[in-house]
Regions:
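Well-ordered beta-strand positions in beta-sheet-rich domains
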Residues: 149, 161-163
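Active-site-proximal segment of tyrosine recombinases
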Residues: 136-138, 212-213, 222, 229-241
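Basic, Lys/Arg- and aromatic-enriched nucleic-acid-binding interface segment
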Residues: 53-61, 72-134, 138, 147, ...
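C-terminal flanking helix
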Residues: 22, 64-67, 71
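A Lys/Arg-rich helix-loop hairpin that forms a DNA/phosphate-binding surface
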Residues: 15, 26-47, 77-80, 91-95, ...
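Short, aromatic/basic-rich helix-turn unit that serves as a nucleic-acid recognition element
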Residues: 1-22
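Short basic/aromatic active-site micro-motif
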Residues: 37, 119-121, 210-229
Length: 242
């Protein structure tokens, strides 16, 4: 499946799909023969994902394509896709801006949490300061860093330029620049990009921000500052990044 399908996907799609297969599908279905996976198995998996609704909604299409491919190869009966008819979670995504106190709590959590991967904090701060998507930060390579901008050749909406404010420039300038094709924020114990979602679950728990998603952090912190009346420099200080 991967060999045949992934070459036709954008690099960012390959990265996110590989992560979802490895972290969500293989642990749950990896020991089941492909022809034995039933609708009931998909529904049980859905039941385990009630606190990760967005992840389920983004991953079940991958599972569905894999089942269709198994049918094509003759490993499953025709029209037996167990994902067909399984409903996705309905999600309301209201705008969520952090208050000054919440920025302060987040700053304390970042300062007091010990990360094995030294790139966690700068990656999260860059997400906050740029309003970029988590996937854009995670897959950022040094050749895309052209201060005072990020030149992304492959974002969700196509090529994209992100202009950097002083806080974002300071974050990137504090990192050791490596070869152009290297990731700015690599994973620690495996090949590939950092998994910000995995780290964020622990950080938001420590910061007592259980309802704040990475998607909320990526809202332009300039917009958040306008909505809450908090100066940009003040947000940097609250996050411990003066």
């Amino acid at each position: 499946f991967w060999t045949d399908y992934s070459p036709h996907w954008k690099p960012s799609t390959r990265t996110s799909s590989r992560s979802r297969i490895d972290q969500l599908l293989i642990p749950h279905f990896g020991e089941l023969p492909v022809d034995m996976i039933a609708r009931s198995d998909i529904n049980r998996w859905r039941d385990t994902m009630t606190k990760r609704e967005g992840s389920f909604n983004r991953t079940i299409p991958i599972m569905s394509v894999m089942m269709q491919y198994a049918e094509k190869l003759g490993y499953r009966a025709k029209c037996s896709n167990p994902c067909r008819g399984v409903s996705r979670f309905k999600r309301e995504l209201p705008e969520r801006y952090l208050s000054a106190d919440e920025y302060r709590r987040l700053g304390r959590a970042l300062a007091n949490h010990e990360f094995a991967n030294p790139f966690v904090i700068p990656a999260l701060l860059l997400l906050v300061y740029t309003g970029a998507r988590a996937s854009e930060i995670a897959t950022l390579r040094w050749r895309y860093v052209q201060i005072p901008r990020l030149a992304l050749p492959d974002s969700k909406t196509g090529p994209k330029t992100i202009y950097l404010n002083p806080q974002a420039i300071e974050i990137l300038s504090g990192l050791d620049r490596r070869a152009d094709d290297q990731l700015v924020f690599p994973a620690l114990h495996r090949e590939g990009p950092i998994n910000l979602g995995e780290h964020w679950i622990r950080i938001r728990r420590k910061a007592a921000l259980p309802d704040v998603r990475l998607h909320d952090l990526r809202h332009s912190f300039a917009s958040a500052a306008i909505a809450k009346g908090i100066p940009l420099a003040t947000i940097g200080k609250l996050l411990g990044h003066a």
